[in-house]
UniProtKB/Swiss-Prot annotation:
The gene is recN. It comes from the Bacteria. The keyword DNA damage applies. GO terms for molecular function: ATP binding. Keywords: ATP-binding, DNA damage, DNA repair, Nucleotide-binding. It comes from Mycobacterium leprae (strain TN). This is DNA repair protein RecN. Belongs to the RecN family. ATP binds at G29, E30, T31, G32, T33, G34, K35, T36. One of its GO terms (biological process) is DNA recombination. One of its GO terms (cellular component) is bacterial nucleoid. The keyword Protein transport does not apply. The lineage of its organism: Bacteria, Bacillati, Actinomycetota, Actinomycetes, Mycobacteriales. InterPro entries: DNA_recomb/repair_RecN (IPR004604), P-loop_NTPase (IPR027417), RecF/RecN/SMC_N (IPR003395). Pfam families: SMC_N.
Length: 587
């Protein structure tokens, strides 16, 4: 429920605060005082587009602040609202209410605040959408649009889940259908691409490269190309350490022999110091002997056949053939091969693959067709009930002979257009255009009097009749949203007399389950208010203020609304009659 709104520098309003209660609240005022700005402010709190031209002349920005409570809402809705608050880091006030604020700068962007935290306007709108249902004169014009009529019917039928399933199937079907059409149109290109990939993969498989093989080959080739030099170095080093491989003379001048002689000489004395040196020489001798042995093994492992280098060079040339075509190194070639195999699976142009895609398209179309039929049935069943309830509401709004109808027809197309349109074949055999919201065309029909031909609403209803149709529809739809604040901005335009009384009576009934806020110019409607607010000019600069009326002030305002009879005794008497009649009607 909306408990308070504060408006600053918006249109004709300089600074104004209005407090709201449960029940029916009406806002009245002379033309030009800015009573519609209250509704404009609520639209801003609902996330509507900010219009800098609405900022009051001389001010830098306009500010709208509202306070909402959620105690009258269903637990499910409250949980959704708490989820939005938690996601944005917003908080409730100590009394559990939530403050929302929107500022509109004359020169810069607008700003939105929810529970003390800055949020995008979209997030603010997501929160207040659950709390406010705003209806204005523009809604009457939207009501004649087919898409708005379908949305109203779906809202009544609770068709959200069915619509969502239909859209999901339609998206999947369109994607698969596009893939099939693309495959058929590009079959030659796909075949050529597949052939190129197969040839390349065959070439790579025939070479059978191993990860890192090209780098290992470079090291081997460098080693083999320096074979003679490596052998000479190793032979000389071994000879210096322990003699040549074929040297059987241990008395030579190599390091092992010399160190052996030194060790023997040191061990031949009784001097402890010299014998300690012998131990150290022995340790070094062990290392030298081991190095000499390993050098011998190295020499034995060196290739003696020059063909080893040739085979390495041939292998390197094979790998270079691949790296020139597919990647900078062998690891890159292997990665390219993996990706190409995946692409080749996608490019499967075999009859079996094409048949598989066709089968998937057919299955998705079958599921989509059934979902469309289910959605159509849901709408048709709901259309009959909704039409009866709206007709009953119109009777309560002084249109006892009015007839309201809803037709739900399938959007069939000629079979010749099947391939050119997003169309599905229905179980009945007909071909229907698969629109984003189903295969149905929804149309509201209306006849104001008995015996008149029912025509589309756009062609048959006057402004006043359209106002009552919209109000009747909203009253019926509102039964599923108890606790929501409903705001009507001059929906009674073009209405007067007995019809105005009936509208006031119906709004009062609606206010038993909802907080209802109405901007009206009709005294018959204003008389039914539980709270009467007037927007009036409060200064020489044309600024307006909002004031709560009671007693004689309220009588005077109703008299003013009665064709400007405010200062006359007859006007006041008539106003009191309206108030008394409304009070009795509500009791």
């Amino acid at each position: 429920m909306l408990t308070e709104i504060r408006i600053e520098s918006l249109g004709a309003i300089s600074v104004a605060t209005a407090e709201f209660d449960r029940g029916l609240t009406v806002l009245t005022g002379e033309t030009g005082t800015g009573k519609t700005m209250v509704v404009t402010g609520l639209h801003l709190l609902g996330g509507a587009r900010a219009d800098a031209s609405r900022v009051r002349s001389g001010a830098n920005r306009a500010v709208v602040e509202g306070r909402f409570t959620t105690t009258d809402l269903d637990d499910v809705v409250v949980a959704q609202l708490d989820g939005i608050l938690n996601a944005s880091g917003s908080e409730r006030d100590e009394d559990g209410s939530v403050i929302v604020l929107r500022s509109v700068s004359r020169d810069g962007p607008s700003r939105s605040y929810l529970g003390g935290r800055s949020v995008p306007a979209k997030s603010l709108g997501s929160f207040t959408t659950e709390l406010l249902a705003l209806h204005g004169q523009n809604d009457q014009l939207r009501l004649v649009r087919p898409e708005e009529q379908r949305a109203a019917l779906d809202r009544y039928a609770a068709a959200g889940p069915s619509c969502e399933r239909y859209r999901e199937l339609r998206d999947a079907w369109l994607l698969a259908r596009s893939d099939l059409i693309d495959r058929r149109n590009r079959i030659r290109e796909l075949v050529q691409e597949a052939d190129r990939l197969k040839f390349a993969l065959s070439e790579i498989d025939s070479v059978d490269p191993q990860p890192g093989e090209d780098n290992a080959l470079v090291a081997d080739i460098v080693r083999l190309s320096e074979l003679d030099m490596l052998r000479e170095v190793a032979v000389n080093a071994r000879a210096a350490l322990s003699g040549a491989l074929d040297d059987m003379d241990v008395s030579g001048s190599n390091a092992v022999a010399c160190m052996g002689q030194a060790k023997a000489a040191l061990e031949s004395t009784d001097d402890a110091t010299l014998r300690a040196f012998a131990d150290q020489v022995g340790e070094v001798l062990t290392v030298v002997v081991e190095v000499g042995r390993e050098l011998g093994e190295y020499l034995e492992e060196l290739p003696v056949d020059a063909s080893a280098l040739e085979s390495k060079l041939v292998r390197q040339a094979e790998l270079c053939t691949l790296t020139r075509k597919y990647a900078a190194d062998i690891d890159g070639v292997l990665q390219w091969a993996r990706e190409s195999r995946e692409r080749l699976e996608q490019l499967d142009v075999s009859y079996e693959r094409l048949a598989g895609v066709e089968s998937r398209v057919d299955e998705l179309e079958r599921q989509l067709s059934q979902a469309a039929v289910d959605l159509s049935k849901l709408r048709r069943d709901a259309a009959n009930r909704l039409a009866k309830e709206v007709t009953a509401e119109l009777s309560a709004l002084a249109m006892v002979d009015a007839e309201f109808t809803i037709s739900v027809t399938t959007d069939l197309i000629p079979l010749t257009d099947y391939k050119r349109s997003a169309a599905v074949t229905l179980p009945s055999g007909g071909v229907a255009r698969a629109g984003a919201d189903g295969v149905d065309q929804v149309e509201f029909g209306f006849a104001a009097h008995r015996g008149m031909t029912v025509l589309p609403l756009a062609k048959s209803a006057s402004g006043g009749e359209l106002s009552r149709v919209m109000l009747a529809l909203e009253v019926v739809l509102a039964t599923s949203a108890a606790g929501t604040t409903m705001v009507f901005d001059e929906v009674d335009v073009g209405v007067g007399g007995r019809a105005a009384v009936q509208i006031g009576r119906r709004l009062a009934r609606l206010a038993r389950t909802h907080q209802v806020i109405v901007v009206t110019h009709l005294p018959q409607v204003a008389a039914y208010a539980d709270v009467h607010l007037v927007v009036h000019s409060a200064g020489l600069d044309g600024a307006s203020d909002v004031r709560r009326l009671a007693g004689d002030d309220r009588v005077a305002e109703l008299a003013r609304m009665l064709a400007g009879l405010g200062e006359s005794d007859s006007g006041r008497a008539h106003a009191r009659e309206l108030l008394d009649a409304a009070r009795k009607d509500k009791s």
